Amino acid sequence: MNAPVNPKKLIKGALGDWEVVIGMEIHAQVTSRSKLFSGASTAFGAEPNDNVSLVDAAMPGMLPVINRECVAQAVRTGLGLKAQINHRSVFDRKNYFYPDLPQGYQISQYKSPIVGEGEVLVDLPEGETIRVGIERLHLEQDAGKSLHDQHPSLSFVDLNRSGVALMEIVSKPDLRSAEEAKAYVTKLRTILRYLGTCDGDMEKGNLRADVNVSVRRPGEFLGTRCEIKNVNSIRFIGQAIEAEARRQIAILEDGGVIEQETRLFDPNKGETRSMRSKEEAHDYRYFPDPDLLPLEIDDAFIDELKTELPELPDTKKARFVAEYGLSAYDATVLVAERASADYFEAVARGRDGKAAANWVINELFGRLNKEGHGIEDSPVSAEQLGAIIDLIADGTISGKIAKDLFEIVWSEGGDPRAIVESRGLRQVTDTGAIEAAVDQIIAANPDKVVQAQAKPTLLGWFVGQTMKATGGKANPAAVNALLKAKLGIE
């Protein structure tokens, strides 16, 4: 049985409410130059079967040798997930036949994984924060790739991925909606990228998700789960969960029974389809790999890796709120990518943190999203954006001119201060010039003057006209003060 669920997360069926229960198995490719048990390269994009050693091809007599860096990356990830690091773990053979698995088994970890229980804090769009338990993290080999579209009657096998190190990160069934699942994968990917243990590139297959979905009436025992294999985008994860939950609800409300099975998500049809019956652990006949000794990790190794860990998203977010006075939402947006957080800090250094966050989130991120660029490709450097903020702060330019200046720097580059001088963008602070513009507008609009005196909110119209008359260069505070004095508005 379980605690009451948030009604907003329930799914409406024809015969009442249902709760969806979701667990995730994330396969994250370890960032390393060579494979888990061989010295073959892990470089992406090589010609088929170029990055294959005799070990990867399972040639007789070839023995696996553990890659120390892959072990270190798994431990770093465990530390980043606030998880237990197991001092002793065992590699097992997971036996099954598939053409792209040349050994006839996969080297994985079953009963004794390298990392035990941990947790991930996940911020949801509506402001709620949930804790998602991590059940385990284990190391295993990736399989090769079967290609069925190269020839009308033949299939081919590419073993470049065979033997590449994967971390399988298994969550507890703590997720209760498609949105929660998407937010969880997004946060997990952020942590991996901060740590440098996986690049999280789903398009290249470096991060893949198996999604376990079941439904139940609120408060009842867990239902029968189905596993949706190899979902390769966060958007598809959400769609797959919603489609599978609806399928199961329809079956149960029709009096049917859910069969435990493995399914695939078809994004074109927006539905899941049966792949095979779900295997149990005994189907794989796990047993310890006789070619590999148990993996033993001492405290000194773990402590050394701890000292090298970067500041992680949750800690960085808390610091941004405390140090720069940011809202929790703005801090969450800024720490979503390590490069974005670093960019913000470079802009905010020695400046007003809230102003820096406003410019980075609204102006820079808005333009980057519009152009389809990442922060690494920004044509406006942190130094340039900081200079624009300085020009506003010291009264050289107005906020409106600053946006025009941002566009110039984005399109043409250059030093913001030099651009202001060369293009005559300095704001007008000469009260005589501003007063002349104000007097002219008041004289030309006597009806508006009467209306503004009766309804002070119309002062904004006069401000706009004055800014227009001065090419946006008038100091807004000076314009406001003059207009209030001349119109007799307090």
Swiss-Prot record:
The keyword Protein biosynthesis applies. Pfam families: GatB_N (PF02934), GatB_Yqey (PF02637). One of its GO terms (molecular function) is ATP binding. The keyword Amino-acid biosynthesis does not apply. InterPro entries: Asn/Gln-tRNA_amidoTrfase_suB/E, Asn/Gln-tRNA_Trfase_suB/E_cat, Asn/Gln_amidotransferase, Asn/Gln_tRNA_amidoTrase-B-like, GatB, GatB_C_1, GatB_Yqey_C_2, Gln-tRNA_amidoTrfase_suB_CS. Keywords: ATP-binding, Ligase, Nucleotide-binding, Protein biosynthesis. Its EC number is 6.3.5.-. It comes from the Bacteria. It catalyses: L-glutamyl-tRNA(Gln) + L-glutamine + ATP + H2O = L-glutaminyl-tRNA(Gln) + L-glutamate + ADP + phosphate + H(+); L-aspartyl-tRNA(Asn) + L-glutamine + ATP + H2O = L-asparaginyl-tRNA(Asn) + L-glutamate + ADP + phosphate + 2 H(+). GO terms for biological process: glutaminyl-tRNAGln biosynthesis via transamidation; translation. Allows the formation of correctly charged Asn-tRNA(Asn) or Gln-tRNA(Gln) through the transamidation of misacylated Asp-tRNA(Asn) or Glu-tRNA(Gln) in organisms which lack either or both of asparaginyl-tRNA or glutaminyl-tRNA synthetases. The reaction takes place in the presence of glutamine and ATP through an activated phospho-Asp-tRNA(Asn) or phospho-Glu-tRNA(Gln). Belongs to the GatB/GatE family. GatB subfamily. Heterotrimer of A, B and C subunits. This is Aspartyl/glutamyl-tRNA(Asn/Gln) amidotransferase subunit B. The lineage of its organism: Bacteria, Pseudomonadati, Pseudomonadota, Alphaproteobacteria, Hyphomicrobiales.
